[in-house]
Amino acid sequence: MENKSNSQILFAEAQQYIPGGVNSPVRAFKSVGQEFPRFIKFAKGAYLYDVDWNKYIDYIGSWGPMILGHCDDDVLEAIQCQVKNGLSYGAPCKQEVDLAKKIIELMPNIEQVRFVNSGTEATMSAIRLARAYTCRNKIIKFEGCYHGHADEFLVAAGSGALSLGQPNSPGVPEDVVKDTLVASFNDMESIQALFEKYKDEIACIIVEPIAGNMNMIFPQDDFLAKLRAICDQNSSLLIFDEVMTGFRVALGGAQSIYNVKPDLTTLGKVIGGGMPVGAFGGRKEIMQKVSPAGPVYQAGTLSGNPIAMTAGIKTLEKISQPGLFDELGAKAQKLVDGLNEAAKAYDFNFHAKCLGGMFGLFFCSDKIAVNTFVDLGKTNLKMFNQFFAYMLDNGVYLAPSAYEAGFISIAHSDEDIEKTICLAKKFFQEN
């Protein structure tokens, strides 16, 4: 009889009580062909430890928030001090003001900000606000860009087709997504066609300025600036979903790198230091439409709770220190350069790229441009799954999906990066 690991046992038990055994689908490891996920016991610095005491170099970082590494001493101390004063008040607290001021200081395109509990809440609220502000209903999103699981976002276009949205999850009525239009990332022609057809009906464009849910795809040929221009020409709002990229690719987010000013920005992940949080913010004249200042309703029992606010304040204080982002970027660049050199040495079809503390792995030649969701079909997903399994078995924890970006933290050491490169080199050599 096969001896089962504690993770296998826990997964079997979890499936009796939790649909699919997990509380977010990608965690089940099904997309990478694994029979069971690893159940984590604790984490510290750059490492995860599972319930079988296996140690992993973690390149997920809780899907982005752990930019300082797990259990940063200063963040933990701040949280522990706040815990003694209460977990949640259901009333305003000073920490909300302090975190709002810090975000606005670091992202000057945001003049006012509202805190929520997740990235999904942030994008959902931003869309509602944009519709109310413009008195229009239709929105444009991009194929392959993920903005949470609100009904209006669970839409995909046909292959290369421009069409009215069709829901791609059961339970989402067609009437809910009939006003969601889908375009192709990095393709201005698809955007122009939608504006020609629905010119006075489009409330906003929502976009990941760097598409981190298509692995990691950068905007090409001034794509973001062109989105800004077409929104201005048609009195539509531009929303940057920086839940993933905010305070991760740069201190001022992707908008500071590309020098494009959105009307609204959504945030999450890093601003909570590992605690559940989200936020949306932007121009004051727009944000003043949010209740109780204006008529657009948004509320939440745990919004702005003092624990998440405290963790966020300390995290942003630390990542604001001079030189930290230079060091973070150097770590990611060392990893990416090492992986690319290893692949080149063995003529292996692979390339990686990075920006700030975020990176993407593509299992195809660097001569193949991957600039759209359709382009991802050119990559070898089966080979990624094999790579994932090999790295996991050897103590490296990567995102369990070829469509997800990876994250590095300030806690990753040169030794961690070198071990990762050495393992990848061996895989490239053997495959």
UniProtKB/Swiss-Prot annotation:
Catalytic reaction equation(s): (S)-4-amino-5-oxopentanoate = 5-aminolevulinate
InterPro entries named among the record's database cross-references: 4pyrrol_synth_GluAld_NH2Trfase, Aminotrans_3, Aminotrans_3_PPA_site, PyrdxlP-dep_Trfase, PyrdxlP-dep_Trfase_major, PyrdxlP-dep_Trfase_small
Residue ranges that the Swiss-Prot or TrEMBL entry lists as coiled coil: none
Enzyme class: isomerase
GO BP term (any one): protoporphyrinogen IX biosynthetic process
Cofactors named for this entry: pyridoxal 5'-phosphate
This protein's record includes keyword Metal-binding: no
Keyword annotations: Cytoplasm, Isomerase, Porphyrin biosynthesis, Pyridoxal phosphate
GO cellular component terms attached to this protein's record: cytoplasm
One Pfam family matching this protein: Aminotran_3
Single GO MF descriptor: glutamate-1-semialdehyde 2,1-aminomutase activity
Recorded family membership: Belongs to the class-III pyridoxal-phosphate-dependent aminotransferase family. HemL subfamily.
SUBUNIT field: Homodimer.
Protein name according to UniProt: Glutamate-1-semialdehyde 2,1-aminomutase
Species assigned in the record: Francisella tularensis subsp. tularensis (strain WY96-3418)
UniProt lineage: Bacteria, Pseudomonadati, Pseudomonadota, Gammaproteobacteria, Thiotrichales
